[in-house]
């Protein structure tokens, strides 16, 4: 049983129709009706050893803990308003917490997002020693009623787009885990993509009324594209040669490039669909948001995700996104 089957089996009971919950489960955010607005609500959990390495810079961790939630709001096209923080710590470390909170507040201030409450506790010890540091953030955003993006609106004929570049975060993690060896200069270029991802909030807002479906790429391009395909009841064809890569990843062997870009995760870019007649508007919206976007495929009738090479042929090796319950115990990738 993978994590999505777990959710579907145990935690997917249809909500009671009260008129308040407009969308619950299956998307990056829940949507709550509030007059002419909707509140977008998301929550993400970060566990030491699973989502981040113990030696991570605490300021970077504070940034990322909030960034992964703001990325979900961006995928919904919502403007961040506030967040709640719950944390479990094995011990009090004032200097560590000073740095963590500084990183957290710096990103919050950049998006006018207020810490509105939370909870703290001590992490229970485990057989190997101290329990892991654990952080859970719930973020709340706002979007005009009826303008939120979901995963279910893609239609045959739409084009598939992605923001920024993919795979740098996975490459940095592979180096930190000893799987590849990067030069210090190369690591300095890709490590911020792993530890300080930039949520594409401005782009998400700019795509209101343009994107037909949207998701943030947290678990890998192939896996997250599959969520759009399943939710929309369509097939996504991805031209892997068109997937944008950074210069460091682009210089790596092909198999490593594909693994990082298609299945690595931790990118926190926006993957979205839009009709071809909106191409100029999409590019203008991206330019206004200060983010590059690339067309990487198309939507067809059918189901699933088809990964194609430069000649338009299916890749021999297919790639899946990150799955918490399929990964080995040493995996430290994200998967929010």
Language-model-derived ranges and their functions:
Residues 1-51, 55-57, 81, 85, ...:
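Extreme N-terminal cap/leader segments of soluble proteins
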Residues 19-21, 29-30, 105, 119-129, ...:
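A generic local secondary-structure boundary/capping motif
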Residues 78-89, 93:
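Short beta-strand-loop/turn "lid" adjacent to the catalytic site in phosphate-handling enzymes
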Residues 65-76, 108:
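A short, N-terminal amphipathic alpha-helix
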Residues 2-15, 57, 90-116, 121-135, ...:
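Glycine-/charge-enriched secondary-structure boundary and capping motifs
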Residues 40-43, 148-205:
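Short, acidic (Asp/Glu-rich) active-site segment that either coordinates a divalent metal cofactor
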Residues 21-23, 54-68, 92-102:
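Glycine-rich anion/phosphate-binding loops
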């Amino acid at each position: 049983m993978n994590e999505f089957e777990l959710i579907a089996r145990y935690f997917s009971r249809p909500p009671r129709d009260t008129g308040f919950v407009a969308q619950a489960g299956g998307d990056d955010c829940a949507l709550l009706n509030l007059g002419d607005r909707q509140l977008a609500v998301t929550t993400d959990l970060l566990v030491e050893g699973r989502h981040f390495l113990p030696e991570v810079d605490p300021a970077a961790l504070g940034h990322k803990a909030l960034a992964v939630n703001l990325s979900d709001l961006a995928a919904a096209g919502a403007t961040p308003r506030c967040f709640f923080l719950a944390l479990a710590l094995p011990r009090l470390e004032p200097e560590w917490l000073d740095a963590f909170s500084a990183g957290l507040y710096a990103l919050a201030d950049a998006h006018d997002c207020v810490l509105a409450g939370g909870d703290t506790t001590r992490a229970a010890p485990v057989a190997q020693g101290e329990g892991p540091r654990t952080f859970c953030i719930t973020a709340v955003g706002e979007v005009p009623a009826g303008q939120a993006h979901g995963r279910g609106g893609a239609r045959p004929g739409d084009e598939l787009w992605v923001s920024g570049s993919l795979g740098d975060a996975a490459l940095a993690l592979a180096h930190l885990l000893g799987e590849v060896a990067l030069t210090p200069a190369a690591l300095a270029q890709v490590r911020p993509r792993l530890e300080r991802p930039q949520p594409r909030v401005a782009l998400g807002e700019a795509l209101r009324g343009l994107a037909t479906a949207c998701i943030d790429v947290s678990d890998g391009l192939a896996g997250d594209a599959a969520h759009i395909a399943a939710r929309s009841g369509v097939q996504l064809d991805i031209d892997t040669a068109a997937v944008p890569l950074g210069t460091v990843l682009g210089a790596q062997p092909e198999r490593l490039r594909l693994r990082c870009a298609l299945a690595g995760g931790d990118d926190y870019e926006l993957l979205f669909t839009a009709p071809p007649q909106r191409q100029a508007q999409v590019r203008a919206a991206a330019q206004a948001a200060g983010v590059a976007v690339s067309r990487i495929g198309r939507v067809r009738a059918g189901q699933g995700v088809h990964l194609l090479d430069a000649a338009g042929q299916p890749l021999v090796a297919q790639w899946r996104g990150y799955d918490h319950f399929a990964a080995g115990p040493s995996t430290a990738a994200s998967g929010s």
